[in-house]
Amino acid sequence: MGDSSELNVRRSVRDLQAEYDRGNRKPLEDLIRAWKGIQELPPDDKRSFFILGGYHGEPFDYRNAVDALPPDDIYTYWGGWCNHGNVLFPTWHRIYILKLEEALQSIVPGVTLPFWDETSEETVKKGIPDVLTREYFELDGENIKNPLYSYTLPLSLSDNVPGDNKAYEKPAGYETVRYPLSGLVGTPEARAATAKHNAKYPNPIENTQLLNKNIIAWLHGSGKDEEGPTTTDPNPKGRGVKWMYEKCLSAPNYTVFSNTTSAGQWNLDHPAKSVVALEQPHNDVHLAVGGFDIPGQGESGQVADANGDMGENNTAALDPIFFFHHCNVDRMFWLWQKQNGFINKLEVITGYYGTNSSDSQGPTPGIPPGTPLDLNTPLNPFIKDEFGNPFTSMDCINIEEQLGYTYGPGSLDEVPKPEPITGGSTKKLTVRGINRGLFDGSFVIRAYASVPDAQGQLTEYYLGDHAVLSRRNVVKCANCLTHLEVIAHFPLDTLSADLVDKAEYWITIQHRGHSKRMKVDKDTGQSEKALLAQRAELPEKLKYSISVTD
């Protein structure tokens, strides 16, 4: 497979769109035709988008390994096949999108899955490529519903979690949504709240404009100016998704590059130089598309109660944009491999955080709790041959030699060396101890510093955000409850050493079901009563620690 002339080339979707606009319509039309085809397949067809999208979370049809266990077994909760927060995150998703691409090729031979180049100049300035947000597309002389815009469920979905309030269940005919809309329709109360919220946003074109403004804000980081971070800018840009993607390419080894659990611990163990895992900017894009806004957007404002499907692991892969996003994540994985000499070999640090099936999200079907994860762990449910052997990470290290595809030109092919911020502190802020089990799904931690001047007036500095892509009811996974700690690190190099010493630090948490950002009291370690009321059945309270380290 190594001959470049035989490789399938995954191109930027924006390049396909530009080629279409210049008159060469076939590549983009073939892509649309293939996506239309897999969405129209019967829902029990293994190539159907319903089946493929469901591997990541709902509809949970393939859970025999779990359902056969006694109801009181700690392993009975299952949230899908996907791997997050562990060393299998990049490789599992590599095979996942390959299977989606193979389904597309069964409809239109030769078509490849393009990537959404999330760090390109066009994306940073304009947001999502138009073909992914256009409601209709002309194909074969007919104006059809664009299959890249959304997906309409042919069957209802259920998360099958005992005692859940079913807010994330979806009926047949449900159409996936993105920011600023809400897709919570599982209960009468949720449907009423969603109808009221979505009625505020009746215009798809204006909704896309809001979505793109949100994406751009996340890419840059907060702040109204267009400059990079400085020691005197109270709302610096430069700590957004684009910066995170650039930063992750310098991760020193596969273990910490691969996932947020390993990277979080690595930053505690190696405080002199922080790392960013590939999974972190990946999480941010999920939440940006799926309903979370970011401070400092100016006139676009902040849309409370948005609940897009991309913002929750259970439903994310049912939005077609998921696969264009993950194609870019896989491209970044390949760029890291090429730029750091790991094209043919990856290594996992045995016994490190993020190398156990119980870390972060908990185990997936067929992988018992407490199982060490390595490059030979099966990437279920994906089968590689006629003998029923599962794919492992060893089968997908070199995408050109082993899988027969490569990537066309894109941003960060030659990653720029970030210019150091002169005069800033070398310290970082560490927030830890927050339990994901307290939250119904994904949430965002945001860190701030307040510094008094000589007159006692406070200046607020926004330090950055840490997105946590999660799923509802992780607390139902009894085995996972001791593995739900979130560790977040925020560089303080936009503050001078003097300001770092004077500052008071605090965080806010934006989460589902709460329209306000809550300032969490550092002294008591407790949140506002509103959060506790949502999960009153939990005996514990939201607590965390903040520390400034060298």
UniProtKB/Swiss-Prot annotation:
Cross-referenced Gene3D superfamilies: Di-copper center containing domain from catechol oxidase (1.10.1280.10)
pH dependence: Optimum pH is between 4.5 and 6. Exhibits a rather narrow pH range of activity (over 50% of activity between pH 4 and 7) and no detectable activity above pH 8.
Temperature optimum or stability note: Optimum temperature is approximately 40 degrees Celsius. Activity goes below 50% under 25 degrees Celsius and past 45 degrees Celsius, and the enzyme no longer exhibits activity at 72 degrees Celsius.
EC top class named in words: oxidoreductase
Catalytic activity: L-tyrosine + O2 = L-dopaquinone + H2O; 2 L-tyrosine + O2 = 2 L-dopa; 2 L-dopa + O2 = 2 L-dopaquinone + 2 H2O
InterPro entries cross-referenced by the UniProt entry: Di-copper_centre_dom_sf, Tyrosinase/Hemocyanin, Tyrosinase_Cu-bd
Residues annotated as binding Cu cation B: 282, 286, 326
Domain notes: Contains a C-terminal lid-domain (LID), which is not cleaved and is essential for activity and stability.
Stated name of the protein: Tyrosinase HcTyr2
UniProt source species: Hahella sp. (strain CCB-MM4)
